């Protein structure tokens, strides 16, 4: 029986989940601009909610695009 090794969270304890932290938020969206699901991100439900809120807030303030127009 083989066990898969648990991946570490991409969010470090020192990272702040904030709408102004575009480098961190861009790790959790696809090239098309969609928010990646929690199972792909390998983060907790609480972190996923905070990431989703921050991405939506950054989109509203035009820090992140709603869609990628380069298709």
UniProtKB/Swiss-Prot annotation:
Belongs to the bacterial ribosomal protein bS18 family. Coiled coil: none annotated. It is found in: Plastid, Chloroplast. Pfam families: Ribosomal_S18. One of its GO terms (cellular component) is chloroplast. It comes from the Eukaryota. Keywords: Chloroplast, Plastid, Ribonucleoprotein, Ribosomal protein, RNA-binding, rRNA-binding. InterPro entries: Ribosomal_bS18 (IPR001648), Ribosomal_bS18_CS (IPR018275), Ribosomal_bS18_sf (IPR036870). PANTHER family: 30S RIBOSOMAL PROTEIN S18, SMALL RIBOSOMAL SUBUNIT PROTEIN BS18M. This is Small ribosomal subunit protein bS18c. Part of the 30S ribosomal subunit. One of its GO terms (molecular function) is small ribosomal subunit rRNA binding. The gene is rps18. GO terms for biological process: translation.
